[in-house]
Amino acid sequence: MREPTVRGRYYEDFGVGEEIVSGCRTIGEGTIDLFAGVSGDFSEVHTDAELMKDSEFGERIGHGILALAVMQGLMWQTNYNTGTVTATAGWDTLKFRAPLRAGDTVQAQWVIKDKRVSASRPTLGILVEACRLVNQRKETILTGEHVLMVRRRPAAT
């Protein structure tokens, strides 16, 4: 197999405190429906508009994990790590702060919180990104720390 084309940035190119912002995406009713089908989570909070009219939300809402998936997709679409990322090592301190609603336009925003060279794999660096997904009302939908493994520049290893 061939090596991936590198359009993204290597570990050395990131600075602690650097902020990165994605483009925007509007969430439709169909997105919520499709995610229910993919995930198998058909909970009425996500699928029953009539029942949810009288809930604390006033309408059905998107899945929390859908919000996470959308945020990760928005992050990927910036191409900040295309060809240099090797894996997501995990999501820490994930918190759902506000509901994701059909019609919301959302944006991913993140800051490089920490970085270190992998002790076990010196060709890789580990980035800790403090991430949040915000909507058009400037409400934070979710927050979390994304731990990402990124290739180091070949000359740096």
What are these model-derived regions, one by one?
Residues 1-16, 96-157:
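HotDog/MaoC-like acyl-thioester-processing domains
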Residues 1-89, 153-157:
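Hot-dog-fold acyl-thioester-processing enzymes
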